[in-house]
């Protein structure tokens, strides 16, 4: 009986020793899983190793990669925040952090973050989208229109582009009705080929030139030759503005610039 008890105790010691001594085998197996792209298995294995070697670093990085590959960038950010100096941790952290900033409406900050990432992943597209959101919020419609278009089908960029185009077009029509032809011209030109923007821009340009020409005539009749000259010279190519500028220029002793 005593002999059996001793054998059982010896067997128990051997079992305990095999469980607690030399975790390097488990570590190496976890590293192999990581190298094979089996990040979920690797994360679980490294987490079981506790503080052994740099298992915590591998565990956080692997867990981050699992979420990253699933497109869960916001959820992955805290994991990469722990390992910013490990492998591609910093780059992946910045990419995920940009998504966090975007989700929180910090579009200027997100744009700066994605811009700094250069051609990493789709950072260039994400920069355009967030820059457009920031520009639109600050009434910089020209930048917003361009960047939404460059953002393509990311998120709701296409919908926002269409909505903004409609808004700008309606504003241009209102300005045109108010005879603010220069401002309307700017907006229609900004819209390019959207709807009939090109034709409306042409009409606004004609009205604007007519108005400026009439203004120059008034200045001339009131004796303001310099003011009339400045306007006529700016209208070079329109009606007889070039001839009028030349005539007034001779009266003022100004040589008309050569226009090819």
Regions found by a protein language model. Name each.
Residues 1-5:
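Positively charged n-region of N-terminal signal peptides that target proteins for export
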Residues 23-34, 57-68, 91-102, 125-136, ...:
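Alpha-helical tetratricopeptide repeat
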Residues 48-50, 82-84, 117-118, 151-152, ...:
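Alpha-helical solenoid scaffolds that mediate protein-protein interactions
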Residues 15-18:
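C-terminal motif of bacterial Sec signal peptides marking the signal peptidase cleavage site
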């Amino acid at each position: 009986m005593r002999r059996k008890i001793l054998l059982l105790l010896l067997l128990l010691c051997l079992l305990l020793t095999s469980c607690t001594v030399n975790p390097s085998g488990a570590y190496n197996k976890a590293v192999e899983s990581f190298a094979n792209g089996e990040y979920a298995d690797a994360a679980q294995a490294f987490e079981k190793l506790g503080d052994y070697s740099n298992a915590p670093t591998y565990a956080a990085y692997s867990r981050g990669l699992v979420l990253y590959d699933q497109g869960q960038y916001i959820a992955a950010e805290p994991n990469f925040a722990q390992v910013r100096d490990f492998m591609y941790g910093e780059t992946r952290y910045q990419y995920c952090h940009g998504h966090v900033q975007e989700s929180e409406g910090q579009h200027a900050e997100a744009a700066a973050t994605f811009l700094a990432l250069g051609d990493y992943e789709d950072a260039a597209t994400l920069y355009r989208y967030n820059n457009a959101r920031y520009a639109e919020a600050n009434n910089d419609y020209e930048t917003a229109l361009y960047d939404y278009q460059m953002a393509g089908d990311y998120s709701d960029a296409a919908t926002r582009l269409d909505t903004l185009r409609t808004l700008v077009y309606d504003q241009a029509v209102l300005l045109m009705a108010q005879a603010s032809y220069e401002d309307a011209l700017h907006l229609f030109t900004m819209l390019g080929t959207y709807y009939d923007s090109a034709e409306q821009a042409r009409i606004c340009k004609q009205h604007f030139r007519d108005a400026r020409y009439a203004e120059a005539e008034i200045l001339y009749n009131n004796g303001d030759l310099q003011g009339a000259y400045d306007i006529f010279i700016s209208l070079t190519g329109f009606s007889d503005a070039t001839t009028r500028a030349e005539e007034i220029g001779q009266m003022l002793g100004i040589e008309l610039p050569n226009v090819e």
